[in-house]
């Protein structure tokens, strides 16, 4: 099922190093963060936890404004505690929902949010223009316009706003020396049944290719 949603992706900076240095401490910090910060703030800002990624979290909101408030509160609280450092990416767009169990979300909106998270500087939030346009004046003034950015595996440039600078050397940025690229372009279907079948094939192929590191892909949703 496809519907409009706000995808929020966050991860812990330097988590692999933390695990290598003291695994028990790293795991305890994550558990503490989930109990003391994530659960209360998701209740407060109406966020729906889709899944925990070990060192990160995939969350869906119905409101762009609430998603940004949640991100800013996370960063404020972890900075105050001084134990973890986060980066967050947020994008508003069409989201493909998989009922499960377990439930999941995927599609271009999830991919863009993931790229935004990866290019955010440590301790910052990067959001798309579609997210920014939904913010109130007080929220909007916290973000700097970083211009159109060409993101890895994303067919068209994305206008990005950030609370700080962007990490333009990130793996989330598209580079000229990248490996093989496959482009998925659908044909116009001749019937409603064929259209549904083609959409399912396209979505499943996109989901599969995005899990592979050795090949890049771009997906054109409409013929």
PLM segments and residue spans:
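Short beta-strand
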Residues: 48-52, 144, 218
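Intrinsically disordered or compositionally simple regulatory linkers and C-terminal tails
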Residues: 1, 163-182
């Amino acid at each position: 099922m496809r519907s409009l949603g706000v995808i929020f992706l966050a991860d812990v900076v330097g988590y692999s190093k933390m695990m290598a240095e003291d695994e028990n401490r790293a795991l305890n910090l994550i558990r503490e963060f989930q109990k003391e910060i994530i659960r209360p703030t998701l209740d407060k800002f109406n966020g729906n936890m889709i899944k925990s990624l070990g060192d990160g979290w995939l969350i869906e909101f119905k409101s762009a404004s609430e998603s940004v408030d949640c991100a800013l509160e996370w960063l404020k609280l972890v900075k105050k505690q001084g134990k973890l450092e986060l980066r967050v990416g947020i994008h508003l767009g069409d989201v493909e929902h998989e009922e499960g169990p377990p439930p999941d979300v995927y599609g271009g909106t999830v991919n863009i949010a993931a790229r935004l998270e990866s290019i955010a500087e440590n301790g910052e939030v990067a959001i798309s223009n579609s997210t920014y346009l939904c913010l109130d004046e007080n929220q909007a003034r916290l973000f700097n316009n970083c211009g159109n950015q060409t993101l890895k595996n994303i067919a068209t440039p994305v206008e990005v706003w950030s609370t700080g600078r962007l990490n333009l050397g990130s793996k989330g940025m598209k580079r000229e020396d990248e490996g093989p690229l496959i482009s998925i372009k659908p044909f116009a279907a001749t019937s409603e049944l064929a259209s549904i079948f083609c959409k399912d094939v396209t979505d499943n192929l996109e989901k599969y290719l995005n899990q592979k590191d050795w090949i890049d892909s771009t997906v054109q949703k409409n013929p």
